[in-house]
């Protein structure tokens, strides 16, 4: 269980800052894949018509988790940077801090 606070003070690489500043933390989420990317256009063209599936579909998945990527936005200059964390099964953003001698909850 990884619990990350919603704000953190860390170094900002922005041209205005270049110092430690307060950052707003959010979790990175991949955007929607474009229909007009060259690979997708080529794949769709190859798939159209008769002949069934033309490229392999990957089945041998090895990993059970993904690396968590944090998106840090500087509160003063709005510069955004990304920070990759280690792999984890449970990730929480801005959850309650642990109390001593309390049972674990998921």
UniProtKB/Swiss-Prot annotation:
Alphabetical keyword list: Antibiotic resistance, Cycloheximide resistance, Ribonucleoprotein, Ribosomal protein
Entry keyword Secreted: no
Keyword set includes Ribosomal protein: yes
GO cellular component: ribonucleoprotein complex; ribosome
GO molecular function list: structural constituent of ribosome
Superkingdom of the organism of origin: Eukaryota
GO biological process: response to antibiotic; response to cycloheximide; translation
Entries under InterPro entries matching the protein: Ribosomal_eL44, Ribosomal_LSU_eL42, Ribosomal_zn-bd
Note: Confers resistance to cycloheximide, an inhibitor of polypeptide elongation.
Family: Belongs to the eukaryotic ribosomal protein eL42 family.
Protein name, as recorded: Large ribosomal subunit protein eL42
Species assigned in the record: Kluyveromyces lactis (strain ATCC 8585 / CBS 2359 / DSM 70799 / NBRC 1267 / NRRL Y-1140 / WM37)
Gene: RPL44
């Amino acid at each position: 269980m990884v619990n990350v606070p919603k704000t953190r003070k860390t170094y900002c690489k922005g041209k205005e800052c270049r110092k430690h500043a307060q950052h707003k933390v959010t979790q990175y989420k991949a955007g929607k894949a474009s229909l007009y990317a060259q690979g997708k256009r080529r794949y769709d063209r190859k798939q159209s018509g008769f002949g069934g599936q033309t490229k392999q579909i990957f089945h041998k998945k090895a990993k059970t988790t993904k690396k968590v990527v944090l998106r840090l936005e500087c509160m003063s200059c709005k510069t955004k940077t990304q920070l990759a964390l280690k792999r984890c099964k449970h990730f929480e953003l801005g959850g309650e801090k642990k109390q001593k001698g309390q049972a674990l909850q998921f």
